[in-house]
Structure formats: C-alpha cells, structure tokens
Regions:
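Active-site environment of divalent metal-dependent phosphoester hydrolases
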Residues: 10-17, 41-44, 103-108, 148, ...
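Glycine-rich phosphate-binding loop signature in dinucleotide/nucleotide-binding domains
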Residues: 23-29, 92, 150, 180-182, ...
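Active-site neighborhood of divalent metal-dependent phosphoester bond hydrolases
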Residues: 55-150, 154-157, 163-182
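Active-site-proximal loop/helix segment associated with metal-binding centers of metalloenzymes
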Residues: 125-132, 137, 148, 159-173, ...
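Acidic, His/Gly-rich catalytic cores of divalent-metal-dependent hydrolytic chemistry
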Residues: 202-307
Length: 307
C-alpha cells in the first residue's frame, strides 16, 4: 500500500492546497493520506484547513464541494490551477486519516499545555480558538492522539508514542529509546524539521539526518550516535532486521529547517521505500493572510524564511 504522511499544517491553506495538488500529480494513486497532527495554530486559515481535511476524511456529506471550491478560489491561482486542485482534492476524498496535535487540542478547548507554550504560540492558539466554527471545534476535539496501522507495520503520532499528550520534542536520537517505540516505524512531526532515526536493541544511531542536521547532540552518546553528512531524501526501510525507525515528516505549513517549502513523506509499505518531498507554494500569500489577521508578525516572517 502507498501512503502519504504529513504534519503541522498549522492553518496554512496555501501550503495545504499546493501539497494536495503535488500529491495528486506526483504520487499517482495512494491508498491513504495520513495527517500527524496540528492542523491549526499559527496560520490565518484554520477553518479552511479543517474544512478540507474533513472533506478528505468524511467526504462531501460533511464538507460540501461548494465550500471547498470557495477555499480554492485564491487570487493567485488561474482557472486551470483551481480546477486541477479541486480534482486533486476529490481524488483523495475519504482516503484521509488524521490525528490531533497540541495546537489542535488547545484550540478546541481540550486540556493541554498552553502554560508551556511561548507567548507567540499562545496568542495564535487563542486567536484560532476564537475563529473556529462549531463544526471544526467538535472535529478537532474528537481527534485521536495516536493511530496504529498493523498491516503496514507503522503508526503515526504527533510527538512520541509512549506519551502522546506530553508533546515532547524529538530533536535528536537521544530523545527516544528502542523500548519507547512501539512499532517498526513511527511517523511523527511537532519539531517542523524532517529527520530519520534508526534504533537497535543495543544502541541508538542516526540513520540519516534527512534534509537537515539534528538540532544538537548529547555528547555522552557521541560514541554510538553518528549523523549522516549526506542530505538523504529517500531510503528503504529494512523490515528484516530488529530495527525501529522514527521518521519526522517535517511541516506543511511552517517549516523550520531553513527551507520554506512544504514538506511531506511518501511511503510504500510493499517496497518499503520512503521519500521526503518538498513543495514550493505561495509563501507571500500565506504571510499576508497572517498579517491581515493581526497575528504576531514573527509568524508572517517565519513563513517566508522557513526558520
């Protein structure tokens, strides 16, 4: 089966539309689109992103095509581009499965970790909470925090599988252990930085620092933890060995690895091949929406810089 896994859309409808179009054009037919949390937060289009995701999950009975067409009607898109994006969304109808992240939980009124959010994030999540429709509040509130796919040998979680509500940042291989990973492959997000780590029963090793280096090293692990000097964008997962993998799929709506392009992962559970993808989109439009919503300017600038 072929899966696309993405995370951290963060209310950025411009990035989401570009990624959906790319998936339809580049990945051919996929079996499932998986979203690893944080559909909202930071960006200025939380309802639009929720409406699209609800359509992808439940189909047109829960989110009509008319409302989707209105969302697609962006001034920088021509009629042909709009038509292609609508076709792409329809092609993924009822193929999506989504879990929640900390911003989703907080914005929907679920107890979370607002006190631990920085002031900019808290300002954005409070604004998001105030503009979300009742339907989207309910939708976010009922999202699971973890989802396992036994046939594929993997699971998705926003941060860590052992304590999904804790929203710990997996910034390097030392943040996890073999015993705290419950599946052969775990796909997560939260840091907004793509990465891939291999864990063995004896040691922790970094298989590949995908696209960017890990944030930092624990010097005590340096003898067993090595980082690839290559910017690997694809590799095969070895199901024959007793290894476990943690794959950070990066961010669609607010990358923080110095590359402003949206990021997602394509995974084929039959061939065991995994690809990281980057998708350019209209960052100026997304940044302008944030400014017009009077959200913190730092968020508008971060969209442009990817950092």
């Amino acid at each position: 089966m072929k899966y696309v896994i993405l995370s951290d859309i963060h209310g950025n409808v411009d990035a989401l539309l570009a990624v959906i179009k790319e998936i339809a054009e580049k990945e051919n037919i996929i079996d499932n689109l998986l979203i690893a949390g944080d559909i909202v937060g930071y960006g200025a289009s939380p309802n639009e992103c929720c409406d699209i995701v609800r359509f992808l999950i439940y189909g047109r009975k829960k989110a009509g095509l008319e409302s989707i067409s209105k969302i697609i009607d962006q001034p920088y898109l021509d009629s042909k581009q709009k038509e292609n994006i609508l076709k792409a969304i329809i092609s993924l109808e009822k193929k999506c499965i989504a879990i929640g992240g900390n911003h989703d939980m907080e914005a929907s009124g679920e107890p979370s970790l607002t006190s631990e959010m920085n002031p900019i994030a808290k300002t954005a999540v409070d604004w998001t909470k105030g503009v979300l429709t009742k339907e989207n509040l309910k939708f976010l509130r009922h999202l699971s925090l973890r989802m396992k796919f036994s046939k594929g040998g993997f699971e998705i979680v926003h941060s860590t599988p052992s304590y999904p509500r804790g929203y710990d940042y997996v910034k390097n291989a030392g943040a996890l252990k073999y015993t705290t990973l419950w599946s052969k492959v775990t796909f997560g997000g939260h840091t907004h930085r793509p990465a891939a780590y291999i864990y063995t029963k004896e040691t922790r090793t970094v298989n590949a620092s995908v696209l960017i280096p890990a944030d930092n090293y624990d010097m005590r692990l340096m003898l067993i933890e090595k980082e690839s000097t290559n910017k690997v964008e694809s590799f095969d997962i070895d199901f024959g060995k007793e290894w476990k993998y943690y794959i950070n799929v990066g961010s669609v709506g607010q990358p923080r690895d110095g590359n402003p392009h949206a990021c997602y992962v394509a995974f084929d559970s039959t061939s065991k091949h995994l690809d990281f993808r980057r998708v350019p989109y209209n960052t100026e439009a997304a940044s302008k929406k944030i400014q017009e919503a009077a959200l913190p300017n730092e968020l508008a600038q971060r969209i442009l810089k990817g950092a």
